[in-house]
Structures are given as C-alpha cells and as structure tokens.
Amino acid sequence: MKFLKFKNKRESLNEGREIKSGFLDEDGKVVELKGDILDYFNADINAVLENIVESYSLEDIEIESPVNPSKIVCIGLNYRDHAKEMNEELPEKPTIFIKPSTAVNKDDNVIIYPKISSRVDYEGELATVIGKETKQVSPEEAENCIFGYTIINDVTARDFTLGDGQWTRGKSCDGFAPIGPYIETELDPLNQRIVTKVNGETRQNSSTSQMIFSPQEIISYVSETMTLNPGDLIATGTPPGVGEMKADSIVEVTIEDIGTLKNYLIKEE
C-alpha cells in the first residue's frame, strides 16, 4: 500500500490547508484517512478501510513529506558497484552519519542551492521508514520495526564535505533531504531498480540488490547505540554515478515500486 501526506489545493488558503494522511488506491485516487500515517503501522486492510474520510484526484492535492522524522540516519558506502567505481574495499560495518530534521523537503519542491557553496550533488537512495520505537534489535527483529520504504535524495554540498574533512555541514543544509512521494509498505527492498536523472539525463542506474548491508542489518547496527523513533528514516546509501547538479536543474529519483521524487534546484539569492 502506498501511504502519503497531502494538502487539498481546493481548500481556502485563508483558512489554512491542513496536512492530511491517506493512501493511493488502485485507480490512482488519493483516499484520505483519519489520523496519521504511522497510526496504521501493522494495521490490516479492514482497519484502514474503516477509517476512510473521502477521496481526491491527484490534480487536487499537493503532496507533503510523508513523515517528519526526528532524525535521518544515513549510510555511507553501501553499494558494491559504487565501491568498485571508487576503488574502495567493501566496508566491514556500516558508516553512519545524520541529517537534521530541518533538512526535510518534499516532492515537487525547490531545493535551495546555498550561495556560499560552489558544488551541490545528488544522491538517490532508498529510505527505510521506522514504524515503532526501536532499540537493540537483531536483524531478524528489525523486520518487525519497519513501516515501509520511501525515496530520499541525500543532497550534498560537496565542497563543504571535502573542505571540512567531515560530512555534517555539507549534508545538513535546509531542504537537503527531499523525501517521498509515497511510503510503500509492500516491496522487496533488495530487488528494486533505482534511477536518478538530471534534466532528463540518466546519471544513476543500479539495483538495490547491490547493497552491502540490508535495511534490517542497518537497523540492527544503528539501534545498538541510538533509539529509533516512529517516523525516523534510514537512508540506505547511494549507487554509483553520484555527481553535480547545476542551478536550475530538475532532479528525479525513481524507485520502481515506489514512484518518482522530483525536485528543482534554485540558486539562493
């Protein structure tokens, strides 16, 4: 099932457009649900259908970020083909870093290219959405902590990361974590085609089957030291082909069973 958050564009701006939760049905309609997406963690289909409010066409809604994570835990080198591209040895354990909640962005929205940066890169990734409080779980137990999967673009100010000697500042600019458009609860995370395009040109084209560490293994490793909250994201690493985006570019990340995350890079004035 594809869950999403959205606003009704037909609601008056003066009254304020409330962020609603819902899912995409088989006919491409957006079905509003009572409560929040995360309320439906482990819910069966009957529980979902009992909480329907009304339906909308996609043309009548504005898609929002599907979650508001307290943190985004990101994984460094996690694709075998990316390691080969960089002439790197396969890591023995995941390399982790964190993007702040202020980096969260949404589908079909602007990414601001910081005026103090000289290079901004795309990194298309599969993201795991945590469904419940998670601490010190095994990989087998981690499967029961996953709400679903979405797309994230781990946008990076590359000149910052190279110049600083560490990643925090270059990964943490406001809006540098577009997420969405949907959370898919039923997919094989290790059998997904992942493609990133810039201005229609394919830059990344790989498969999540190339992952070194599975989402479940990553959750287990991360949860050894930090509590993962419902709605937190784990970005599972990017495939080969990472590169620069120029100002005024359109970047699209597609994962076959989720959809396409599309954003526009605009230079800060």
Which ranges hold each PLM region?
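N-terminal non-catalytic cap/leader segment that marks the start of a structured domain
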Residues: 1-94, 187, 202, 254
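N-terminal accessory regions of nucleic-acid-interacting proteins
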Residues: 135-149
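Catalytic-pocket segment enriched in acidic/His residues
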Residues: 56, 62, 66, 82, ...
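Structural signature of FAD isoalloxazine-binding scaffolds in flavoprotein oxidoreductases
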Residues: 90-107, 122, 252-257
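Residues embedded in well-ordered beta-strands
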Residues: 125-129, 150, 195
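A structural-propensity feature for long, helix-poor, extended segments
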Residues: 107-127
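Short, conserved beta-strand element in jelly-roll/cupin
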Residues: 127-132, 220
